[in-house]
Swiss-Prot record:
Protein name: Photosystem II CP47 reaction center protein
Alphabetized InterPro entries for the sequence: PS_antenna-like (IPR000932), PS_II_antenna-like_sf (IPR036001), PSII_PsbB (IPR017486)
Classification via SUPFAM superfamilies: Photosystem II antenna protein-like
GO biological process: photosynthetic electron transport in photosystem II
GO (cellular component) term, any one: chloroplast thylakoid membrane
Annotated source species: Nandina domestica
GO molecular function terms noted in the UniProt entry: chlorophyll binding; electron transporter, transferring electrons within the cyclic electron transport pathway of photosynthesis activity
Subunit structure: PSII is composed of 1 copy each of membrane proteins PsbA, PsbB, PsbC, PsbD, PsbE, PsbF, PsbH, PsbI, PsbJ, PsbK, PsbL, PsbM, PsbT, PsbX, PsbY, PsbZ, Psb30/Ycf12, at least 3 peripheral proteins of the oxygen-evolving complex and a large number of cofactors. It forms dimeric complexes.
Gene that encodes the chain: psbB
Domain of life, per lineage: Eukaryota
Amino acid sequence: MGLPWYRVHTVVLNDPGRLLAVHIMHTALVSGWAGSMALYELAVFDPSDPVLDPMWRQGMFVIPFMTRLGITNSWGGWSITGGTVTNPGIWSYEGVAGAHIVFSGLCFLAAIWHWVYWDLEIFRDERTGKPSLDLPKIFGIHLFLSGLACFGFGAFHVTGLYGPGIWVSDPYGLTGKVQSVSPAWGVEGFDPFVPGGIASHHIAAGTLGILAGLFHLSVRPPQRLYKGLRMGNIETVLSSSIAAVFFAAFVVAGTMWYGSATTPIELFGPTRYQWDQGYFQQEIYRRVGAGLAENQSLAEAWSKIPEKLAFYDYIGNNPAKGGLFRAGSMDNGDGIAVGWLGHPIFRDKEGRELFVRRMPTFFETFPVVLVDGDGIVRADVPFRRAESKYSVEQVGVTVEFYGGELNGVSYSDPATVKKYARRAQLGEIFELDRATLKSDGVFRSSPRGWFTFGHASFALLFFFGHIWHGARTLFRDVFAGIDPDLDAQVEFGAFQKLGDPTTKRQVV
């Protein structure tokens, strides 16, 4: 059978046993990849600094997903939140990876068994003796089972009733930990940033799935609906399954890119909108303002800013700064963050505090402009010295650091002031180690960016797949050239004009 590559799946079209076999093999591949990828990531992951070198800076992709479901400890004796553990238990990172690999092996064997023993009695219609599947019944079974799993996840795993809970954090990603979550049954449950909505929605959706599954098991579809939606055709199953998958992919691409309770910034990195809106900058200034109101000095107020919060307020952690095809982790780009140098405060010779305009997300270069509290430009680094009026030298700008490693250090020589003004464009200033990984200094995206790009791309592809297979199953008779009027159209002498039903001859 000389099939072209895009038609090879027709070999399982009317073969339920081997259709099942290839799906089990696919599950084996997916599970095997997940387990192997987890082991690879654990081999290269450095857990020593959860603040300045978290999993998302290191380009971890599957570790964040395990962590958000409640896995925090490793058989290597470390915890994702820092510190050591003595008894991580079976459900550690390695335990989950191993379970996936064992499951993959079992699926592999099951796939081979079903490929060899494809002609089972269960796949044959007892009335006709031909291979056939009761698709509406199978739909009911799957809906019931997935509803049961969905309900169980929401009612037991997330709530901590029988399970660890999920990763929950504060709005600024500072205090995250795995904890049990109570379902949010009020209107707050519809807020995508409220973790309680995850529990309540899984319980509600699971209940609906169980009831819908029982309905489809006990009620047969009407004949007209069965025929109209081609419920006896396996390609209908393919089309509607693709629809479910692409819809889910679009949804998770959105929750990942825009942020939600399911995609904590401690695990996947901040979103681009948090940089665009100055989200962390506002919180830092609020905390400093609160400290000053309590009669703390500027240095004391800035010293109390958590390094973790300052690190979020750095453009290198913005997932939209990495080029789409720049491979590698964020650490391979601007380097491994070593420490916060402190917050630079610039002043002109008249004592006015100046603020460096920050680089917008989609700029690679941006002019260095310093404005006062009213937004009036007071200093810059000019492109042409001959025409400059606001140069650092002319205005006499100085810089002093508060908090961090350079706390209390000030500079007045123009070259150093300009250096730190350029770096202040990129948010808070950090010392970055580019030697260890031979980092090239070009920003990379975080797993948040990769996940979004991948899922949005595949969702679009699967959308077209749904249209394609839906059209094929709905119009199969047309595409195959099978038409109820076909006999009459080609019968010699049926029409005065060949194939024209308006000129049908009268039977004498």
